C-alpha cells in the first residue's frame, strides 16, 4: 500500500500544548485548545486540502532569483490572507512581516550558497508565508507549499517569526518533502523532524557566521516568553534540557537509544518530536568533533544523505546512520568517516564494520542500542 505523507509539519508538538492546556488558567484554555486541536488535526490527517489556501507545491516555473510573498491573515484562519509585502517591497513596519521576509531570504541564501540548491524544490520555488494566523495561535507550520506563523500568546510563546531557526526549520520541511519525503511517523518521522532541526540550526549559524563551538544549538531560542523557565523548544546539545517549566512541563527528549520512547502512533505520531533528540545529538556530536563551520562538513554529509536514492521513506535511525557514514567517506576522508561512526555510537546507534560499506537502506533494520 502506498503511504501518502502528511505534508503539514508544526513546530510545537501536541504534548507541549496539552501541558499548557492542563496547567494554564481557565481564561486561557480556549485559545490553547484551538491551537492544540488544529495541530493534532494537521498531524493525524494524511491529506488535508482546503479551497482557501495556496497550493504552491506543484509550481514548475523555473527561476534563478528569490521571490518572497508575505501575507497577513489578520488573526483569522483563512489562508493565505492579504498580500502585504512582495519581493522587492520596502519594510512593512510590521515586525512579523519584516522578520518573515528577512529570514526567508536567509534560509534561501543558506541553501543556495552552501548546497547550490535553488530554493526548496531546486527549481526556484516561490517562498510564501502567512503571519498573524489565528487568535494568539501558538504554533508555526509548513503545509501545502507555504509557511504559517501564529502570534503566540505573549505569556508562553512570543511571535513565531522571532526565531530565524524556526523559519529555517519549517522551510527545511519543504526541502525534505521535495527530496526524501520521509514518512511522518515513528523513526522516519523523528528523522524528518531532526533533519529540519539540523538545517534550521545551520541557517541560524550561517546567518550569524558562527562556528560549531560558538552556537547555542537551541531551537526556538527567542520563542519562550519572559518568565518561562527554559532556553527554547529543543536543545540539540542537551536533548531533554531545553525547558522545565510549570506550564510547559519538562522537555521529554532523549539523547540516547537507551531512553528511546516507544510511543503509539496516536501519541506525537509515534514520538516524532521526542525521539528526534537522538539523531539531533548525533549531528551535534559530529559538528563538534569536526570543528569549524558545521555546514561545511557535517551539514554536507546530512544533505547528501537526504538526497541519496537509497534512503527509504520509512527509514530507521540505523539505516540513515549507515548512509551518513557512506557520504562522510565519499565526500571527505577516513577521519571524517570515523568521526561520523563515533558520533552515532555515542547515542547508542552502532554502524557495524561490515555494514559501513553497504550504504543501502532497506528501511527495515532496527537501530542497535548496544555500544
Swiss-Prot record:
Active site (catalytic residues)? 170, 273
Cofactors that this protein relies on: Zn(2+)
Q: What does this protein do?
A: Metalloprotease involved in the inhibition of insect antibacterial peptides. Reduces the antibacterial activity of G.mellonella hemolymph by 50%. Reduces the antibacterial activity of cecropin A by 80% and completely inhibits cecropin B.
Put simply, this protein is called Protease PrtS
InterPro entries for this protein: Metalloprotease_M4, Peptidase_M4, Peptidase_M4/M1_CTD_sf, Peptidase_M4_C_domain, Peptidase_M4_domain, Protealysin_N_PP
Q: Which GO terms describe its molecular function?
A: metal ion binding; metalloendopeptidase activity
Q: What is the lineage of its organism?
A: Bacteria, Pseudomonadati, Pseudomonadota, Gammaproteobacteria, Enterobacterales
Gene3D superfamilies, alphabetized = 3.10.170.10, Neutral Protease Domain 2 (1.10.390.10)
State the compartments where it is located. Answer: Secreted
Entry keywords, A to Z: Hydrolase, Metal-binding, Metalloprotease, Protease, Secreted, Signal, Zinc
Amino acid at each position: 500500500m502506498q503511504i501518502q505523507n502528511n505534508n503539514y509539519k508544526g513546530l510545537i508538538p501536541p504534548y507541549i500544548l496539552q501541558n499548557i492546556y492542563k496547567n494554564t488558567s481557565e481564561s486561557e484554555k480556549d485559545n490553547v485548545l484551538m491551537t492544540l486541536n488544529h495541530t493534532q488535526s494537521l498531524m493525524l490527517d494524511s491529506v488535508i486540502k482546503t479551497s482557501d489556501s495556496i497550493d504552491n507545491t506543484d509550481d514548475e516555473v523555473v527561476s534563478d532569483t528569490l521571490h518572497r510573498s508575505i501575507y497577513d491573515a489578520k488573526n483569522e484562519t483563512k489562508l493565505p490572507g492579504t498580500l502585504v509585502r512582495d519581493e522587492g517591497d520596502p519594510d512593512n513596519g510590521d515586525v512579523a512581516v519584516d522578520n518573515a521576509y528577512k529570514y526567508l531570504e536567509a534560509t534561501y541564501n543558506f541553501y543556495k550558497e552552501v548546497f547550490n540548491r535553488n530554493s526548496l524544490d531546486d527549481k526556484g520555488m516561490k517562498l510564501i508565508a502567512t503571519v498573524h494566523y489565528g487568535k494568539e495561535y501558538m504554533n508555526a507550520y509548513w503545509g501545502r507549499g507555504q509557511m504559517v506563523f501564529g502570534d503566540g500568546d505573549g505569556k508562553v510563546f512570543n511571535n513565531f517569526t522571532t526565531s530565524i531557526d524556526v523559519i529555517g526549520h519549517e522551510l527545511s520541511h519543504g526541502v525534505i518533502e521535495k527530496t526524501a519525503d520521509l514518512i511522518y511517523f515513528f523513526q522516519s518521522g523523528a528523522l524528518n523532524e531532526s533533519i529540519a532541526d539540523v538545517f534550521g540550526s545551520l541557517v541560524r549559524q550561517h546567518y550569524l557566521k558562527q562556528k560549531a563551538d560558538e552556537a547555542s544549538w537551541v531551537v526556538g531560542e527567542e520563542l519562550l516568553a519572559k518568565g518561562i523557565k527554559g532556553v527554547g523548544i529543543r536543545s540539540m546539545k542537551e536533548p531533554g534540557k531545553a525547558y522545565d517549566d510549570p506550564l510547559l512541563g519538562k522537555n521529554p527528549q532523549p539523547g540516547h537509544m537507551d531512553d528511546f520512547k516507544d510511543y503509539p502512533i496516536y501519541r506525537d505520531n509515534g514520538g516524532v518530536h521526542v525521539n528526534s533528540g537522538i539523531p539531533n545529538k548525533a549531528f551535534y556530536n559530529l559538528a563538534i568533533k569536526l570543528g569549524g563551520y558545521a555546514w561545511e562538513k557535517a551539514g554536507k554529509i546530512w544533505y547528501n544523505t537526504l538526497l541519496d536514492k537509497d534512503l527509504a521513506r520509512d527509514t530507521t535511525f540505523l539505516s540513515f546512520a549507515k548512509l551518513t557514514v557512506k557520504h562522510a567517506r565519499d565526500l571527505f576522508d577516513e577521519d571524517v568517516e570515523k568521526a561520523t561512526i563515533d558520533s552515532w555510537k555515542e547515542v547508542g546507534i552502532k554502524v557495524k564494520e561490515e555494514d559501513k560499506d553497504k550504504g543501502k537502506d532497506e528501511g527495515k533494520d532496527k537501530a542497535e542500542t548496544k555500544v
